[in-house]
Amino acid sequence: ITITAFWCGWTGPVVWNFYEGQETLGLVPTAYRHQRMNEILAGAKFAKSLGVNTVVTHVGFLPENPYDPHYPALLVCLRKIAETLSADGQDFLFETGQETPVTLLRTIEDIGCDNVGVNLDTANVILYGKANPVDALDVFGKYVRGVHCKDGFYPTNGRELGREVKIGSGKANLREVIRKLHK
């Protein structure tokens, strides 16, 4: 068995919805950013000790507006993680979900490090109502370095995520995702 990636979590409150999730998930919330950055860097060292060169995490609800006053400081944090991992020969991947494909693309471009990419969670883009995975590949496909296959349905209210379901019974269209990844 080959471990291809290490998913690195973080401490503090975590709420997986559209309201509290904005304030609790990933590196976006300023109240938890520094601590979580250090936890991700420690997790990356642990991954390296296991021989794993890819670190994945949810960064959180990236600002859609590039002029959001919190965006520059978030980029500094993400660039520090990317540069630290690069020095150790590791890649840093965004687990998809809370962000639109174009916002994720812009953020990767703005970080400007060659070791930054995408771990495509085929259900999360649906569960958060941000995209379908087939079309998302048109936007950030060249950055996909890992895939986390799941399936699900879009949200049916404005507060809670969509519903995750058994692979093949939701909207992910995994056959087309895989076909497109192999193009």
Walk through the language-model features, giving the residues of each.
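Short acidic/histidine-rich active-site segments
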Residues: K183
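Acidic/histidine-rich catalytic cores of soluble enzymes
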Residues: F6, P69, L75-K171, R175, ...
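Glycine-rich, aromatic-flanked loop segments that form ligand/cofactor-binding clefts
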Residues: T2-V15
